[in-house]
A protein has these predicted regions:
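Adenine-nucleotide phosphate-binding core of ATP-dependent small-molecule kinases
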Residues: 88, 230-286
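Conserved phosphate-binding catalytic cores of ATP/NTP-utilizing and phosphoryl-transfer enzymes
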Residues: 144-168
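Glycine-rich phosphate-binding loops at beta-strand->alpha-helix junctions
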Residues: 121-128, 267, 281-306
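Short glycine-rich, Thr/Ser-proximal phosphate-binding strand/loop in the N-terminal lobe
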Residues: 55-94, 184-185, 190
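Short beta-strand-loop/turn "lid" adjacent to the catalytic site in phosphate-handling enzymes
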Residues: 87, 106-147, 159-160, 239-243
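Glycine-rich phosphate-binding loop plus the immediately following alpha-helix
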Residues: 184-230
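Glycine-rich phosphate-binding/hydrolytic loop that grips phosphoryl groups
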Residues: 157-163, 297, 302, 306, ...
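Phosphate/pyrophosphate-binding loops at sites that engage ATP/ADP/AMP, CoA/4′-phosphopantetheine
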Residues: 100-116, 280-288
Length: 338
């Protein structure tokens, strides 16, 4: 017996409601006594009512953007593209990124045109820079209402929801705020990886390469680093001062720390990295639970929890990304199925 399995998306109208359906077609051929018989079976799954409009949620850091297309019944389709940051990209560059990376992933979704709200949370989305992102999205999603917020608001919504507390981002960059359940009421300026971004991957990478090339770590570690990355001090200077996205470059080097936490010198470097953040930033906020978003917080959470406990802070959620929390937070913004 031979089998052939195909699938496709199609639209179906049932009782005046429009659905996006995934069709799974199983076609088989069975031969017996010189005759062949063909049969087919069609299975419909993932029925999504698209009579009502949907929303698009974006969580964008400096390295990647996580997109979620949410239907009225709560079903989501998720996509990933490069990071979008209006401090580092023009509106045209942002538009090109969305056109070239997001839209091809959504090409099979014939219902993408029914998006009527977009909530974009992004690094660098200050009140002055947010219009750059809005203009780029408006040029593509012409019928959608677009709201652009900072990644800090996204982190607070994602990790705290409607509860009050301290929300922190520790990813490629770093930031923090006090959230009253509805809005940010206090924010210690992040200032970027050169002047601030305490606790971030970029600053951890900066500290690592500085200590390595200034002979503050062992020869064993320096040799291991060189064998893995094969870079010189001149390479670091070129990538940090002459090439785009130096923060991403430095953050990528911080991975060396996570791979060598069994080395006491690296373990101490990482502890001191978070301890500096805890002592310099967190005391400026009310004494409430501290929640974290970001890959650095997530992958170093054992050290982070110890540092916060040593400094007398209560740790809340530590999530790699805010999207699950944002999906829950924005359910109210999707029009209900009629």
């Amino acid at each position: 017996m031979l089998y052939n399995i195909n699938w496709a998306y199609t639209l179906a109208r049932v009782k005046k409601k429009l659905y996006l359906c995934k069709l799974i077609i199983v076609w088989s051929v069975h031969c017996s006594e010189g005759r062949c018989y063909s049969t087919s079976k069609i299975t419909i799954e993932n029925n999504i009512n698209i009579t009502n409009s949907m929303i698009l949620i974006a969580d964008s850091g400096s390295t990647k953007t996580h997109w979620c297309l949410m239907a009225a019944n709560g079903h989501c389709e998720e996509f990933f593209t490069d990071g979008i940051n209006p401090f580092q990209q023009t509106s045209d560059a942002i538009k090109n990124s969305v056109n070239n990376q997001l839209l091809p992933q959504m090409a099979h979704l014939m219902w993408a045109g029914s998006i009527n709200k977009i909530f974009f949370y992004g690094a660098g989305c200050t009140p002055e820079k947010s219009p750059q992102v809005a203009y780029a999205l408006e040029a593509i999603f012409k019928s959608a209402k677009i709201e652009v917020y900072s990644d800090m608001v996204g982190a607070a919504c994602g990790v705290l929801g409607e509860e009050s507390g301290i929300a922190c981002i520790l990813g490629t960059g770093g930031n923090s705020c006090y959230w009253n359940g509805k809005e940010i009421v206090k924010n210690v300026p992040a200032l970027g990886f050169i002047l601030g971004d305490e606790g971030s991957g970029a600053v951890l990478g900066k500290r690592l390469v500085s200590d390595l090339f200034k002979n503050q770590l062992s020869e064993e570690l320096k040799e291991k680093f060189q064998n893995q990355y094969g870079i010189t001090a001149a390479d670091v200077i070129d990538n940090v001062y002459r090439k785009p996205f130096p923060n991403r470059y430095l953050a990528s080097l911080s991975k060396f720390c996570s791979e060598n936490m069994d080395n006491p010198l690296i373990a101490q470097l990482v502890y001191d990295h978070f301890d500096y953040f805890a002592k310099r930033i967190l005391p400026q906020y009310p004494a409430e639970p501290v929640g974290f978003i970001g890959s650095i917080a997530y992958y170093y959470q054992d050290v982070l929890k110890k540092v916060l406990a040593d400094n007398g802070f209560q740790v809340g959620k530590i999530l790699q990304g805010p999207m699950d929390g944002l999906k829950e937070y924005h359910k109210k913004d999707v029009e209900p199925t009629m």
